Structures are given as C-alpha cells and as structure tokens.
Regions:
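Start-transfer (signal-anchor) and selected internal transmembrane alpha helices
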Residues: 1-24, 107, 115-126, 215-223
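Perimembrane helix-loop-helix junctions
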Residues: 2, 195-225, 232-233, 238
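Transmembrane signal-anchor helices characteristic of membrane glycosylation enzymes that use polyprenol
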Residues: 7-36, 131-136, 185, 222-237
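Extracytoplasmic catalytic/substrate-binding loops of multi-pass membrane glycan-assembly enzymes
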Residues: 30-43, 55-72, 78-85, 240-246
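Short acidic/glycine- and proline-prone juxtamembrane loop motifs at membrane-interface regions
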Residues: 36, 61, 137-150
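Transmembrane-helix motifs of polytopic, lipid-linked glycan transferases
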Residues: 89-117, 157
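Membrane-interface transmembrane helices that cradle and orient dolichyl/undecaprenyl
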Residues: 116-119, 158-174, 185, 203-207
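Membrane-interface alpha helices of multi-pass inner-membrane proteins
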Residues: 134, 161, 173-190, 200-201, ...
Length: 267
C-alpha cells in the first residue's frame, strides 16, 4: 500500500519542525558557551568587518564560518553581552542549512528505494531525522563554535547529489550543484578538498556510460575553482607558496606524532 504523498510531506514537515525546535533549544541553552577556537573565529570575523584581509586570510582557519559570523555581527552589532548569543544564532542558522541539505539527501534516498511505500517511508523518515538530530546535537554539536555544521551541510548536499547521479540524473545542473557543494565545503574546512576527490571519482564512475560525462565532471571542477580559487590564490600569495591550508600540519603533529597540545604549565 502506497503512503499518500501528502501524508509523507506532512510527516516530513512535522519532523523538520521538531528538529528545528531541538536545535533552537540547544542553541539557546548554550548561548554563552565559548572556547578557544571560537575566539579565533570571532577575531577573523572582526578582521573581515574591518576589511583587514591580511589578518582575515589565515592558513589554519578557513573563511566561510568567519564570514557568517561577520555578517551576523555586522547586521546585529551586538554589545559585548550579546556577542556570544549572536554567534550561537549563526550556529543555529548553520544547523537549519544542514537540516535542509540532509532533507535533500534523504529525499533522494527514499525516492529511489521506497517510492513512498508504507510503513517503510514513515519509518525511514523518522529514523533519518532522529539520527540527524542526535548526530547534530551530540557529534557535530551545535553548541561548539566551529564550522563543523557547515561541513556537515556540504557533505549532506554532495551526498544528495551523488544519490541522484547514481539514480541516472546526469544533467549539467546536477553536476554544477555538486561543484557548489564541494566548493563551499572547502571554504568551510580545507579537508573537504580530499572528500571532493572521492565524490567526483564516484560521480565519474557512476555516470561513465553517459556521453559527455567528462565535460560534466569538469564543470563541477570549474565551479569549485570559481568558488575556492580566490581564497586559495590569496592564501598562496600570503604564504609565499601554493597552498590550500596548513591545518593538517598541526593536526598531524597532535594526533599522529603526539606533540603536546599545550605548552608546559609548570606543574
């Protein structure tokens, strides 16, 4: 028995509303939380507002999240007391964006596999949104002042595009959307560049029998370059070498070589 499309839409809307409520409650409860990385992102956001690009372009901190913070600070112009709550408002906006991208991904999966069969569609919708809320609040953590939620959004969106490519949608528009997702994902965090190789390789493999697939993948790469290229060029000029970021060096030192994260405190 097929689940009526209107019923599925209402259920989806209800689950999305519940997810937004959970996100809003968590963002409000953590509105005064802050940690060291968040302070650095705020410093970069303030540099962006001053148009101090020498300070804003940084090989360790990626630019997309500070740009969101700068936009919010520029719009609301909060006092010192309200500055951190505005930061968590940005986190909630990032959470809502991630929710929309997750919906796009889940809709693609369900439309290809369940065709609104009841109760399967209802069960998978409920399970999917429950996992999204849990992972966003506990693993990605909406309370943490970081770009991780924007990275999650880009991965959800790219995954949704890949699902549609696997299903046979090989249009230029879908490959353009893949480039947009991966380009902004890189601006959120540089490691998305490595993920981009995986996504583009899978897209190429799954659409390999489609005439003109190379041109479509090249379109994805071109759009990525248009989005990320200016930042890479500025960063490379500032660093004196071609680079997409240097955060991997510190993380390799901390997590592979086990270099102490903090200097000796004298105890």
């Amino acid at each position: 028995m097929a689940a009526p499309a209107t019923t599925v839409k209402r259920l989806t809307a209800g689950l999305a509303a519940i997810a937004l409520v959970f996100g809003a409650v968590e963002a409000w409860a953590s509105r005064f939380d802050m940690y060291s990385d968040g302070v650095s992102y705020l410093d970069i956001a303030e540099a962006m507002l001053r148009r101090d690009w020498q300070a804003a372009v940084n090989a360790y901190w990626s630019p997309l999240y500070p740009a969101f913070l700068a936009a919010a600070l520029g719009i609301f112009k909060p006092s010192g007391y309200w500055e951190f709550p505005v930061v968590h408002l940005v986190n909630f906006v990032a959470y809502a964006i991630a929710l929309g991208c997750f919906h796009y991904f889940l809709k693609g999966v369900l439309s290809q596999n369940l065709q609104h069969r009841a109760p399967s569609a209802w069960l998978w919708l409920a399970l999917g949104y429950a996992l999204f809320v849990w992972s966003s609040l506990r693993l990605v953590d909406i309370a943490t002042v970081s770009p991780d939620m924007l990275v999650a959004a880009s991965v959800y969106l790219a995954s949704g595009v890949l699902v549609r490519i696997i299903a046979g949608n090989h249009s230029f528009a879908i490959f353009a959307l893949l480039g947009i997702a991966l380009g902004f994902g890189f601006l959120a965090k540089a490691p998305v560049l490595a993920l981009s190789v995986v996504f583009l390789s899978l897209a190429l493999f799954k659409a390999r029998r489609r005439a003109g697939v190379i041109s479509r993948v090249l379109l994805s790469l071109l759009i990525m370059a248009v989005i990320a290229g200016p930042y890479i060029a500025r960063l490379s000029a500032a660093s004196g070498k071609i680079t997409t970021g240097e955060s991997w060096r510190l993380n390799a030192a901390w997590y592979i070589d086990h270099v102490p994260r903090y200097h000796w405190q004298g105890n």
